[in-house]
UniProtKB/Swiss-Prot annotation:
S-S bonds: none
Keywords: ATP-binding, Kinase, Manganese, Nucleotide-binding, Serine/threonine-protein kinase, Transferase
Catalytic activity: L-seryl-[protein] + ATP = O-phospho-L-seryl-[protein] + ADP + H(+); L-threonyl-[protein] + ATP = O-phospho-L-threonyl-[protein] + ADP + H(+)
Protein name (Swiss-Prot/TrEMBL): CBL-interacting protein kinase 15
Native species: Oryza sativa subsp. japonica
GO BP annotation list: signal transduction
The protein's role, per its UniProt record: Involved in salt stress tolerance. CIPK serine-threonine protein kinases interact with CBL proteins. Binding of a CBL protein to the regulatory NAF domain of CIPK protein lead to the activation of the kinase in a calcium-dependent manner.
Domain Protein kinase residue range list: 12-267
Protein family according to the UniProt entry: Belongs to the protein kinase superfamily. CAMK Ser/Thr protein kinase family. SNF1 subfamily.
Binding site for ATP: 18-26, 41
Record-annotated NAF domain positions: 298-333
Length: 434
């Protein structure tokens, strides 16, 4: 049914695969009656039910029907069969804004200004309808054939009716590098204020080519986010810097509002003419091999000298999250290319360590605890590529909220992933946030 050229429900001719995620895939398609090009997102019903995504899907449909804006990807219709759910959406042929940034290294302030105005217009519209996106990032921003911005992926959106009696949202969603400090803290938060923060991170990334908050691990990155620790590079205009510091204010009560953003000089007028010439020169001199968004880190005390380096791509997770955990919906995020896995838990550190020891015993693994919060596990016999070893590091965000990272250090990668999938993952299900 889903192969190229096949007819779907006597209405659409399916074409090439546009993308694939954890819970579905997107195909290009053509409406047989109108000849209109569309994108069809296909999701498996059984998988949705299995991982408890049915409420998430209902929310996405409701949200997309509430919003109709020129800078938001439109939902045309929803269809279903016994086994599948189909979202028929507007086809946006220009690709992801993320790809444009990754290819160029960074954008000029002039170009970023245009996209930011369109982003704020779309977000402001959503907020006026009681809808908060909660996962704004360059990968969720598409470009049409005229280079106009389109906001997509309302899978994490929260309606205003989702608020508790205190008027605040209480679920932790979004991609870690773009999420607001109050969301990380797991306290109630204003969905509009958290979206504004994410817009600020996006604007920074567009003009800088790298993230404002970076660290050797998630805990350090979260610390910087919570304290609003970032510096603007020298090529940012003063008015842009001033606006960014107001947007990425770690205190949501003093953070700038969308209305005030619209009234700011940089938003209304854009960068000054003399800065435009400077930015064009900088852009022309940017090498084609500049590392994309997260492949760059600033030197200490020399933030203008940016060099590419390989770091964990924290903003490329395939995340669909609406649980207490950041990015898992009760499951692991496994990054095969780095042989890493990550999950969250609301258990105490001692409970987590005790559980890990039980799992190691059941799987016939040796355990050695370290003083710096790292638990090392290793196999008891040689594998295909030596003895399998991996480190487990526990980060405390709050006393009742921990992030656990697992990294392979030696042995066969295939054996490691098999152990994760068949042994560790199911054994830890009772401590992973659901």
């Amino acid at each position: 049914m889903e192969s190229r050229g096949k007819i779907l429900m006597e209405r659409y001719e399916l074409g090439r695969l546009l993308g694939k995620g954890t819970f579905g895939k997107v195909h290009y398609a053509r409406n047989l009656e109108s000849n209109q090009s569309v994108a069809i997102k296909m999701m498996d019903k059984q998988q949705i039910l299995k991982v408890g995504l049915s409420e998430q899907i209902r929310r996405e449909i409701t949200t997309m029907r509430l919003v109709a804006h020129k800078n938001i990807v439109q939902l045309h219709e929803v269809m279903a069969t016994r086994n599948k759910i189909y979202f028929v959406m507007e086809y946006v042929k220009g690709g992801e804004l993320f790809e444009k940034v990754a290819k160029r290294g960074k954008l000029t302030e002039v170009v970023a200004h245009k996209y930011f105005q369109q982003l704020i217009s779309a977000v402001d519209y959503c907020h006026s309808r009681g809808v908060y996106h909660r996962d704004l990032k360059p990968e969720n921003l598409l470009l049409d054939e005229n280079e106009n911005l389109k906001v997509s992926d309302f899978g994490l959106s929260a309606l205003s009716e989702s608020k508790r009696q205190d008027g605040l949202l209480h679920t932790t969603c979004g991609t870690p590098a773009y999420v607001a400090p109050e969301v990380i803290s797991k306290i109630g938060y204003d969905g509009a204020k958290s979206d504004i923060w994410s817009c600020g991170v996006i604007l920074f990334v567009l003009v800088a080519g790298y993230l404002p908050f970076q660290g050797p691990n998630l805990m350090e990155m979260y610390r910087k986010i919570q304290h609003g620790e970032f510096r603007c590079p020298g090529w940012f205009s003063r008015k842009l810097q001033k606006l960014l510091y107001k947007i990425m204010d770690p205190n949501p009560s003093t953070r700038i509002s969308i209305q005030k953003i619209k009234e700011s000089t940089w938003f209304r007028k854009g960068p000054e003419e003399n800065r435009i010439l400077k930015e064009r020169t900088l852009n022309e001199n940017t090498t084609k091999n500049v590392a994309p968004v997260l492949g760059v880190r600033r030197k200490k005390n020399a933030h203008e000298d940016v060099k590419p380096m390989s770091v964990t791509n924290l903003n490329a997770f395939e995340i669909i999250s609406f649980s207490k955990g950041f990015d898992l919906s009760g499951m692991f995020i496994v990054k095969e290319w780095r042989n890493e896995a990550r999950f969250t838990s609301d258990k105490s550190a001692s409970t987590i360590i005790s559980k890990l020891e039980d799992v190691a015993k059941a799987l016939n693994l040796r355990v050695r605890k370290k003083d710096n919060g790292v638990v090392k596990m290793q196999g008891r016999k040689e594998g295909r590529n030596g003895v399998l070893q991996f480190d487990i590091e526990i980060f405390e965000v709050t006393t009742s909220y921990h992030i656990i990272e697992m990294k392979q250090t030696s042995g066969d990668s295939l054996e490691y992933r098999q152990l994760l999938e068949e042994g560790i993952r199911p054994a830890l299900k009772d401590i992973v946030l659901a």
